[in-house]
Structures are given as C-alpha cells and as structure tokens.
Amino acid sequence: MTTSAPEDRIDQVEQAITKSRRYQTVAPATVRRLARAALVAARGDVPDAVKRTKRGLHEIYGAFLPPSPPNYAALLRQLDSAVDAGDDEAVRAALRRAMSVHVSTRERLPHLAEFYQEIFRHVPQPNTLRDLACGLNPLAAPWMGLSDQTVYVASDIDARLIGFVDAALTRLGVAHRTSVVDLLEDRLDEPTDVTLLLKTLPCLETQRRGSGWEVIDIVNSPIIVVTFPTKSLGQRSKGMFQNYSQSFESQARERSCRIQRLEIGNELIYVIQK
C-alpha cells in the first residue's frame, strides 16, 4: 500500500463523505484536508480513510450537533413569527431555542447575558466584529449590546449552518456578512476591530498541533477574544482549566501579548491585545 495520498483517492473519500447526510455540507477544503491525512494514516486504504475522516469530522464538528441535522427551517419560522409579532421576549426565546441545538452555545445559555456583558466591558465597541468557527454564536447578537453600525462577519465550516445564521441575522436586522471558511486552509487577514474565537482552539489543536496560535497570529484584529471550555462534553473537568490556562498564557508571554483572563460558567476567557 502507498503512503501518499493521490488526488483520485482523496476524491473517492470526499465523494463518500458528501453522501453522508451528517457531513455533506461541510466545507470541501475541510473534508479534503482531513481525507489527505486519513489516507496517509490508512496507507492508502480508501474505506479505512473514509472511517478516519468521519471520525475526524465528528471530533471537530459532529460531536457538537444532534445526530440528525437540525431543522433550521422550523427554527427560522419560529424566529420569523416572533419578529413579525414585534415581541422582543419571544424573539429571544426563539433564539435561545435555536442556540440550544449546538452544544457550544447550549452550555453558554445559563450565563449568556453575563458572558457578553463581561466581554464587552473589556472590549471597545467594534465597527466590525469577526466570529471565526462561529457555530450558532451570532444568534446571541441581541445580548452583545452592539451598535446598529456594527458589521458582524461570521464564518464556519458548515454551509447549512451558515445559511441559517445568515437568514437569522437578516431577520434580526443585524448588518452582517457570512461565509464558509476553513481556518487552516483559507485566508484570515481581512481587517476587523475584534475577532471572536470561542471554544475553537482545542478543535484546531486536535487537527494540527500549534495551529491555534498560528490562527491568532494571522488574524488581522487588534483585539481577539479566545475562550476554552473548562469541562468536557461529558461535563468532566479533567484538569482542563489548568492545562489550557498554563499553555495559553505561556504562549502569550512569548509573544508579548497583553491578556485579561475571565471565567464565566464553564468557560475560560482571554481578551488579547496584539
């Protein structure tokens, strides 16, 4: 068996992944990058590489969503009804329901108002706010206290999710741009005032060691907000606070970055000034 990953075999793995309802809307760049590494690990065995690629996608994406894709159309109809009724509480309730389908935002719901109030107490009001690997974070825009002039720039590897985020922000009247972006493949040098990287670095590090700070270094923002979970998806701490804080703060010192550390709920927060 070959230890290289010829393009035709990468194509075969990609085609198998796109037939999967669970992963068919993941960015092709992400699928091909994982497929290439999987083929090398599988010594060119395509069926084995497909399994490895799906396993990789589960770790960085699938584990955070329900087994079947969320019914974004139904969630959008609920939001539409609330917006049309002009009922702010109903709008927020619809947004909370939508955010609850993604583990990352669901974990934040009990502390949602406090979370963003505390962050934006340490961050100047941005004209442009970029949210990388955004998941359903942009649906929390009403809790962020952003000005009407702020442009929310959101991206993720899931085209289906990004389509929903785009539609939801449009309904909310939030100025925005959305795109499908792979943080390890695509350009990240668009200038923005503030960038959010919420619970993203651990997923990057599972794909390529050191890539978390590579992304931070490349991102063209004077202020970056990075967060880490302090409990696993199974709600075990496993020393995560200590591990993440020691490693991250060591890297920040090497780069002479100014950081502020916060902790809200099960989330460790760093406000970085580059």
Swiss-Prot record:
Additional facts recorded: Protects M.echinospora, which is an antibiotic-producing bacterium, against self-intoxication.
NCBIfam families reported in the protein's UniProt record: 16S_rRNA_Rmt_gen
Name of the protein this chain belongs to: 16S rRNA (guanine(1405)-N(7))-methyltransferase
Role this protein plays: Specifically methylates the N(7) position of guanine 1405 in 16S rRNA. Confers resistance to various aminoglycosides, including gentamicin and kanamycin.
Binding site for S-adenosyl-L-methionine: F64, H102, V103, S104, R108, A133, D156, D182, L183, L198, Q207
Enzyme class: transferase
Any GO molecular function: rRNA methyltransferase activity
InterPro entries documented for this protein: rRNA_MeTrfase, rRNA_MeTrfase_GmN_bac, SAM-dependent_MTases_sf
Keyword Repeat attributed: no
GO BP, one annotated term: response to antibiotic
Catalytic activity reported: guanosine(1405) in 16S rRNA + S-adenosyl-L-methionine = N(7)-methylguanosine(1405) in 16S rRNA + S-adenosyl-L-homocysteine
Top-level taxon of the source organism: Bacteria
